[in-house]
């Protein structure tokens, strides 16, 4: 007999239901979570024993959408779901980021969270309820998880914040922000914005955190009701004696090493110091646990770097907390691409290209929330050579997909509409060097490459990554963090925007206790850094090029009557196929009669435009045309006056003199001048050669080829 435990609560305009005990009972914990009609099944399984020698926390979050949730059958050949889509990967990362820091240090047992979307209301995206459901499942699992966390989406319209806006409300919202955190702290923010001020963005984070508290409280009550026994896991005690010995042997050397500005040289020096420490420890005691010693040496590195920063000493590369690394900007670096740029900030570098295409090149997405067409694509590649390593090269990893989407979020607010710029645009950011903040270098490089390609973006966009080191009440906010400062610090806070405001904000916090004051300082510091970077970028290229690349397709737009669309397409698409082949263009026709012609030369475009005009032209009564005889019959001849439009010259209208046999006067293929006498209601055209001959001075309109 199933005895489910259920908890219901109101989150804004939506009813949230959490239920356990009925489905997936062999998992460590399972929760069916629903927000109105959008339902997800969340399962958590944790292994009771860690693998021997494992020195990291193997947490896996799998988010999977099922087509049946939206009443669909998958469109693939196999008619079943395949590898995760980009959207599924991004939501898996969104869930992973706030829960990972809530597991204790030293916990290395394998944990897998699987979120399956089983029902979806197209108005309610599954990401927020997936995060809430994951938090609830972890809370009742007995795992050492210091949650629960809540989650909320925040919109901003007409100066008002909106809690969990519907999908139909988002297009008119100036903000799409997801925030997650505990009852006392914000842990994760992911957002895109329409150039909003720092105050509005911070207000949205605070508002979302306040509103999600109802979810945090409900999950705590749910946990108390389920009352799962906690695991008897005890955090491993650090060997203080061994740590002291390592510090005695190497603290001064580590301190010196972290003043070497070049990353590769610094890493080599640290490696040497670590090897000599291990050698000394083993010489003194052959039974020393080498892995434990390596972990403690890493702890010493962390203590040294953080201590230097909080004590007011220069950072690893000699900068003060607010300084930006040296910048170098180049545009138009690749001869045949439509737009290109190299953006270098210290030891982080991005080679970014922009490619223009027609609407046929836009990405078509078949998602649970409906079919979409995306004319702007941004792809981020992080090859192993950019950090001086060898490694596997293949399809993009989760991190690359996430960084690409963040850079795209930063650019969306400044992209022109399709009416202003009817092109599909693909940007690719190749990270050629990396020492922190490569996603923000991609934002800067994308802005430069788009301007180089002649894309009329509304403003230049720059991105900056901020960090934080907090020890007790002392804290230091760092601008433009290095990879080591990201790894050893307490916060990764990325801000992209224009001189007018913020377009994207991403925040990941590893500790509790980040106050509103700290976030405000970080935002203000980021604004100053962003303004500086934008000034350097504007020196290199102050605005978009006046014209697109000679190698890019040129799109010409014209309008035809909707009832003429079939004339351009022809039977089975024959006419449009012939048009594209003979003119060397790409032609797209929309339902409203808009015709877009993409050509690499003006001559090709003009040829296609003239042919389309001829195909869609109306035959006018009283007008003279030069046409070709296409068929001879006993009672007259059919003459083609416009493409696809023939008219009849009756035998009585061929000549002033009596004609007994049409073939004696006319032959097929013969060019003749005709005058339009009548176009009847059925579209039948009556022509006259005789009438045309009466006015030899009048110039005939030539028939289009």
Swiss-Prot record:
Keyword Glycoprotein: no
TM stretches of this protein: none
Major subcellular location class: cytoplasm
Cofactors demanded by this protein: Mg(2+)
Catalytic activity line of the entry: RNA(n+1) + phosphate = RNA(n) + a ribonucleoside 5'-diphosphate
Cellular localization per UniProt: Cytoplasm
SUPFAM superfamilies, A to Z: Eukaryotic type KH-domain (KH-domain type I), Nucleic acid-binding proteins, Ribonuclease PH domain 2-like, Ribosomal protein S5 domain 2-like
Superkingdom assignment: Bacteria
MF annotations from Gene Ontology: 3'-5'-RNA exonuclease activity; magnesium ion binding; polyribonucleotide nucleotidyltransferase activity; RNA binding
Residue intervals of the S1 motif domain: 622-690
EC number(s) per entry: 2.7.7.8
Gene Ontology BP terms: mRNA catabolic process; RNA processing
Residues annotated to bind Mg(2+): 486, 492
GO cellular component: cytosol
Role summary: Involved in mRNA degradation. Catalyzes the phosphorolysis of single-stranded polyribonucleotides processively in the 3'- to 5'-direction.
Assembly with partners or alone: Component of the RNA degradosome, which is a multiprotein complex involved in RNA processing and mRNA degradation.
Protein name (database record): Polyribonucleotide nucleotidyltransferase
Organism listed in the record: Colwellia psychrerythraea (strain 34H / ATCC BAA-681) (Vibrio psychroerythus)
Gene assigned in the entry: pnp
